[in-house]
Amino acid sequence: MKFVGAHVSAAGGVDQAVIRAHELEATAFALFTKNQRQWRAAPLAEDVIEKFKLTCEKYGYTSAQILPHDSYLINLGHPVTEALEKSREAFIDELVRCQQLGLSLLNFHPGSHLLQIDEDQCLARIAESINIALDATEGVTAVIENTAGQGSNLGFKFEHLAAIIEKVEDKSRVGVCIDTCHAFAAGYDLRTEEDCEHTFAALGKIVGFQYLRGMHLNDAKSEFNSRVDRHHSLGEGNIGKTVFSYIMRDSRFDNIPLILETVNMDIWAEEIAWLKSQTEIEPSL
């Protein structure tokens, strides 16, 4: 089964994200459990936690259909010890919040070396950060997102994701989320069925589909291999609609959140309906 939705606002309370997803007729959704541009947030109150869980139950969302995202401020590969510790503490707090809400996944960007340490050192720091955070929490899987490779961000190569996973001690609690815009901007072509076959074969070989825990379905304003992260609405960017139809028809992408982060939220309901319609098309041979 395909779980399709969008990254919805949690303004007014995390339970409001559930309602917004339901209004889109989404079968999945993403959210921030706190203000993503602040380091600290008040702990989740018991009534807030209970309201979120009851609203999920009311509208039929399980933890397998929900892909929360952590704060953009966190850098688990930070080259400066003090800043790294701050990021690690914040990441643990994000995992705890997910744990309290009954969520099983936490999506995050791996980290940046800021031109101060080399890639391998940064990847090792990211893995160490994940190990520390997983040791301090339970029940939530750390889901590493591929990046476009802007600036000094790592995670733009599938090999980066594989290198991090290799160093994570509890393999049962680590996974990946593949963003189509990021992949395209990082040099993984997705414009034709043949391109999709090639790119996802590489993902399977280098990372392994057993680690795929979610997808971000975004077209790209940015050019192929530009290392620039600019999302667009489905079919309106440089990738086109082929890959999104491909994903909806391929069972390797079943039972994970497939999340829109496209630029026009006014057409999310239409985009979700179109994605759902693609499951009825026979797969290409």
Curated annotation (Swiss-Prot):
Q: Does the keyword Transmembrane helix apply?
A: no
The entry's Zn(2+) 3-binding residues are 182, 229, 231
The record's SUPFAM superfamilies line, in alphabetical order, gives: Xylose isomerase-like (SSF51658)
Q: How is the cofactor bound?
A: Binds 3 Zn(2+) ions.
Q: Which PROSITE patterns match?
A: AP_NUCLEASE_F2_1, AP_NUCLEASE_F2_2, AP_NUCLEASE_F2_3, AP_NUCLEASE_F2_4
The EC number on file is 3.1.21.2
Instruction: Tell me where the transmembrane regions lie.
Output: none
Task: Provide the leader sequence positions.
Answer: none
Q: Name one GO biological process term.
A: base-excision repair
Concerning InterPro entries, the annotation shows: AP_endonuc_2 (IPR001719), AP_endonuc_F2_Zn_BS (IPR018246), Xyl_isomerase-like_sf (IPR036237), Xyl_isomerase-like_TIM-brl (IPR013022)
Residues holding Zn(2+) 2: 145, 179, 216, 261
Give the reactions, separated by semicolons, that this protein catalyses: Endonucleolytic cleavage to 5'-phosphooligonucleotide end-products
Q: Which domain of life is it from?
A: Bacteria
Would you identify the family this protein belongs to, as annotated?
A: Belongs to the AP endonuclease 2 family.
**What PANTHER family has UniProt attached to this entry?**
APURINIC-APYRIMIDINIC ENDONUCLEASE, ENDONUCLEASE IV ENDODEOXYRIBONUCLEASE IV
**What's its job?**
Endonuclease IV plays a role in DNA repair. It cleaves phosphodiester bonds at apurinic or apyrimidinic (AP) sites, generating a 3'-hydroxyl group and a 5'-terminal sugar phosphate.
Q: What is this protein called?
A: Probable endonuclease 4
